[in-house]
């Protein structure tokens, strides 16, 4: 069955590349077709009718003409949601949106299962544009839920080695719960008492949370999690909107630590760095 020469789809613009003197290649996550590359002709001219609708983070309804390769042509563009301006006006929102866009592309470019990632990406960009929550916490929740949708859960209620349930009683005492800024997680799990450990590598098929019984068996750097940190991490992975009640009130050191662990684990699982993560700013406590 031949594919149609023209079609329409809703798209989230992830990034753009210059092409020639007046054109751009638009890299987008589409609702039905996943990652799509298409040429927008003459959009860099001042007289372009829809250049502004094809900026990063825009949510746009597009019409395409199929190309001979995987590079198609955009023929029409209509704005669905204009997220670019409010995101660009807030540096933290912009850097978090850039990492979200990079991660969305990485998670969907080699798979046909993109519906969940599309929905999560749209929700995260909308939340950033509307200023609904701290940008770094929107990114943290996006990391947890998008990686889970891609088959790589970053946190769970069971030990990833033995499968036994984790409880807050497992996170007692000093668990080496240092503060990790964006992409900069501590690699110690010293201290006394029982602790749940977080393992950022994918060594031997195990990563993320380990129970107190399994943690000593893993000969890799670990980071201890206190009960409050585990509770926050589990909230970020929840699909329940009420989880924001827990996420929004968490102390900054807790939120920053979990974001750092998530970023490091995600990059280990993807087996390449997220270039935009280096620009992320640490969350600043409210005065």
Regions found by a protein language model. Name each.
Residues 1-24, 29-287:
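Non-catalytic alpha-helical scaffolds and adjoining flexible linkers that form interface surfaces
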């Amino acid at each position: 069955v031949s594919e149609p020469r023209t079609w329409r789809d809703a798209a989230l613009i992830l990034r753009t590349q210059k092409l020639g003197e007046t054109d751009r290649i638009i890299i987008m996550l589409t609702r039905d077709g996943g990652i799509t590359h298409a040429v927008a002709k003459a959009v860099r001219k001042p007289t372009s009718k829809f250049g502004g609708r094809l900026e990063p983070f825009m949510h746009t309804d597009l019409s395409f003409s199929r190309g001979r390769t995987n590079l198609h042509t955009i023929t029409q563009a209509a704005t669905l949601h204009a997220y670019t301006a409010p995101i660009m006006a807030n540096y933290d929102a912009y850097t978090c949106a850039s990492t979200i866009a990079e991660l969305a592309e990485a998670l969907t470019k080699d798979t046909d299962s993109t519906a969940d990632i599309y929905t999560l990406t749209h929700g995260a960009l909308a939340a950033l544009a509307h200023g609904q929550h701290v940008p770094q916490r929107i990114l943290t929740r996006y990391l947890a839920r998008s990686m889970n949708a891609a088959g790589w859960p970053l946190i769970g209620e069971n030990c990833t080695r033995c499968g036994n349930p984790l409880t807050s009683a497992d996170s007692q005492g000093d668990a080496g719960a240092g503060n990790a800024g964006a992409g900069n997680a501590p690699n110690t799990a010293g201290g006394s008492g029982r602790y749940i450990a977080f393992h950022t590598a994918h060594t031997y098929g195990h990563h993320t949370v380990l129970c107190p019984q399994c943690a000593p068996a893993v000969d890799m750097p670990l980071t201890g999690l206190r009960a409050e940190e585990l509770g926050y991490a589990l909230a970020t992975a929840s699909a329940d909107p009420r989880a924001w009640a827990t996420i929004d009130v968490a102390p900054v050191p807790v939120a920053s630590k979990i974001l750092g662990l998530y970023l490091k684990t995600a990059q280990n699982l993807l087996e390449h760095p997220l270039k935009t993560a280096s620009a992320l700013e640490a969350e600043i406590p409210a005065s």
